[in-house]
Amino acid sequence: MQDQQLLRYGRHILLDDIGVEGQDKLLASRVLVVGAGGLGSPVCLYLACAGVGEIRVADDDTVELSNLQRQIMHGTDQLGELKVMSAKDAMWRVNPETRVVPLPERLAGDALLEQVKAVDAVIDCCDNFQTRHAINRACVQTATPLISG
């Protein structure tokens, strides 16, 4: 771990349950976040701040004015922009070392399965039951840990 990383993640490293080994695991981890709205916004930002190595964020929606009071990752400057691109910019601002992969689509079927296979964990921040069920099925099929918000 580099000196700058030791400074950035020092508070994590001090925790007995994390330490240097745990932080190294976070830096090497890959997470898929489905949904970049009200729940996905803080999730993405905290994952980036924690030092997750790669965050794939999937959402097919654009930033609207009505989103701004609850979707903290987006701002007035991003109105009309794809949420995943706004998310990428926001995560880069808090941690430029995190690799962000924007997926501007509603994941389903084989595309969802391929994304789930490519990560260590999935965080479901979507807003509809059909997608939640599909995510759950893909995670069960691939034995990928799932956190549902």
Where do the protein language model's features map onto the residues?
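Adenine nucleotide-associated cytosolic modules
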Residues: 1-149
